[in-house]
Amino acid sequence: MKLRRILALSLLLLSTLTPASLAETAHPGFYQPQENAAMDYDDSESRWSFARSAESELFLLFWEAGFCENPLNAAPDMRVDTADLLEKAELFYAENVDRLHMADEPLPGGDKLQIYLLYTADWVATGAGYDNRIGALWISPATCQPAGSVIAHEIGHCFQYLTYCQALESGAPDDSRAGFRYGYAENAGNALWEIGAQWQSWQSYPEEMFTDYEMETWFQQYHRALENEYTRYQNYWWFYALTEQYGLDAYSRIWRESAYPEDAYQTFMRLYLANDLNAFYDALYRYASHAVTFDFATAAPYSAAWQGRYDATLYDVGDGWQRIAYASCPEANGFSAIPLDHQGANRVTVSFRGLQPGSALAVDDPGLYYIGDEATPENLTGHTRIYNAVDAAPGWRYGFVAYLTDGTRVYSDVCAEDEGAVSFDIPEETQYLYFVVLGAPESYQVHVWDNDESMDAQMPFEIRVEWRK
């Protein structure tokens, strides 16, 4: 009789369990996302099923029915080596946890991260998570044949997502005001997620920091603000400078200790510079001057072929003066790198004159600007005859960088005057010489993702160059 009562109670309890709770009970480390709460993961007819899955110590991988029992046996264009994918995922996990310290173990809930492999020829690569509980990514075969930096990038997004989850575990309110779950304007967008995920992926694939596509875009767009939407996949160089000077934990601290409404660089200022804006611009100019020759330890094995590529455009405005082009004008926190043809000279003097926002462009400057989500030719549809008339008191930092034939760099002192002249004795064996100008307005300017270049804070200027032999 007692046994019957126990069996009846057990059956009653089982009858009240949802598919999610049954699956979680049967599969330790599995958390069933709320959006799939009604799905039976133990049913092979479900879109996602343990009948079509594989797992490693820290990841669960599910694939759609089109792959059948094993994606490795699919048609060549859909074939995926799931063992390789999981092995690489474990390495990317270790990079983010053990080296970058993006999350503490155990992760929220102690659950495994989840990978969902879609049966589609389209390019699908999205990383984030579910329910402020687990990291998850959704991918297609084209992104993992074999698994590489794309998967590292998306797992980087998972750990960005998890910074907020761990803040909640530590008692933070669930108000999307930590872990950069917030944007800097009404559209709730910020470029940090993509910039950061690129840098995180290059930790596993450092040689890919220099690729033709990324570098072509970078050399055209580097003058933009640090979190500009148009360089959201290329503006990762700042994090090399940051972590080289302050350690790898500086990157994860910015994510994990962010506070609304700060952007990443305001968080950096608070954590490391006591909110001193001048100290920030000093650090930023140091970064810009080093970025001109990619003078970062991690970049050293790969940078030689990319020297001498910066080429800011200027237009003559009379009496030897040249005015920076609209398309090369440094935005707030961005920089311009002007190559100087130093042949036969041993000293250069540059007269500098800062201009007000809204000043007239040079006559020959076409004044075209981008309107749209990306800086592509079809989006170059705006036209203006003035620099952007934003409400920002302008400021600058500027100086010289010499790159010698043996790879040595020589840096001048930095100047911050609105108008003045600076000189530099050109070292022997100088191969490339640059005049570098940083946009450093008197008050910090948060960059808003608005898909309209004409709204960006520009710091225009003009220069006159004189040589002595």
Model-flagged regions — what are they?
Residues 262-469:
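Beta/coil-rich, acidic/histidine-enriched accessory regions frequently appended to metallopeptidases
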Residues 136-212, 216:
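Zinc-dependent metallopeptidase catalytic helix centered on the HExxH motif
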Residues 81, 85-92, 147, 151-155, ...:
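Stable alpha-helical elements in mature extracytoplasmic
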Residues 93-102, 157-164, 202-206, 243-248, ...:
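Sec-exported extracytoplasmic/periplasmic mature domains
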